């Protein structure tokens, strides 16, 4: 949920310094400081609770204290995604007043780009998942080693599958923090206090069937560093985000809850796609391998 705000610059600097001093001890993936409380990890664990993930595999996907996990990778310094707007559902900002910095169609294009990237990553996860179990139902490479790099390049098929799942989940979780989807209505909206849509559940628009139009009134904040210069006169990320419990926008708990619901929905959608593509028998075995810490012992 967290972007490169001044606090994140401190975190990034600490991470780089830590890497230089002790490469084995990079420990900032799920931050529990500077107002942050491992939101992506907590959302993922809540959303996937009861889905059958082994403890070690869930640690890889969600992260744990001292690691980013697959879901936290877009916020990791050096991964190259911190300032990629669609990886965090940013820059879909618009306000109904003359001369606003971008048009409604431009804002909607940014929102569509975020959704498109989510499903591109889910499609990549679906493709890599096929390497875990062969058509004859024998196992492929099901290992993860001691850890997964989640660097966009290296890793076993299971690591790459988890990585792409994590990238998709990160964007969908950020959507609820960075947009006005769950926000309470504002009686007199302004650029600094934009309207809320007051939804209580996941956005159908982020589901597997793309509706024809972006939901009316949906926006996300303009992100840039520094925002006062990059987003002058616009609905800023700073105005809309619910990244931390102390945000002035309010709605943190609701955003966390709905993001967890969407996380489970995305896993269920992905599971259905695995079965549809690879058949029930092979597909169920693939899903078992993804979830299991010891797949060759537990997946038959």
Protein language model features and the residues they cover:
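Bacterial N-terminal signal peptides that target proteins for export
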Residues: 1-12
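Classical secretory targeting signals
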Residues: 18-19
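N-terminal signal peptide c-region/cleavage motif recognized by signal peptidases
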Residues: 22-23
């Amino acid at each position: 949920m967290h972007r490169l705000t001044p606090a994140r610059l401190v975190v990034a600097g600490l991470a780089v310094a830590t890497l230089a001093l002790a490469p084995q001890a990079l420990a900032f993936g799920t931050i529990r400081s500077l107002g942050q409380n491992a939101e992506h990890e907590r959302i993922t664990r809540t959303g996937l609770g009861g889905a059958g993930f082994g403890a070690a595999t869930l640690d890889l996907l969600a992260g744990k204290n001292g690691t980013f996990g697959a879901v936290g990778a877009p916020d990791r310094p050096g991964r190259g995604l911190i300032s990629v707007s669609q990886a965090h559902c940013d820059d879909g900002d618009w306000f109904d007043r003359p001369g606003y910095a971008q048009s409604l169609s431009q804002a909607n294009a940014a929102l569509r780009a975020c959704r498109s990237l989510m499903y591109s990553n889910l499609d990549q996860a679906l493709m890599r998942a096929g390497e875990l179990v062969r058509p004859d139902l024998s196992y492929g490479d099901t290992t993860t080693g001691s850890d997964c790099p989640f660097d966009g390049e290296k890793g076993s098929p299971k690591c790459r599958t988890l990585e792409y799942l994590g990238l998709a989940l990160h964007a969908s979780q950020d959507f609820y923090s960075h947009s006005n989807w769950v926000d309470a209505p504002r009686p007199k909206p302004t650029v600094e206090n934009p309207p809320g849509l007051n939804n209580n559940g996941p956005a159908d628009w982020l589901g597997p069937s793309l509706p024809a139009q972006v939901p009316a009134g949906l926006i996300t904040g303009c992100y840039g560093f520094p925002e006062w210069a990059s987003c002058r006169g616009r609905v800023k990320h700073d105005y809309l985000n619910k990244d931390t419990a102390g945000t002035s926008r309010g709605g943190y708990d609701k955003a966390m809850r709905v993001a967890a619901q969407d996380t489970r929905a995305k896993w269920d959608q992905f599971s259905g796609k695995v079965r549809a593509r690879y058949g029930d028998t092979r597909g169920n075995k693939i899903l078992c391998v993804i979830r299991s810490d010891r797949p060759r012992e537990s997946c038959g």
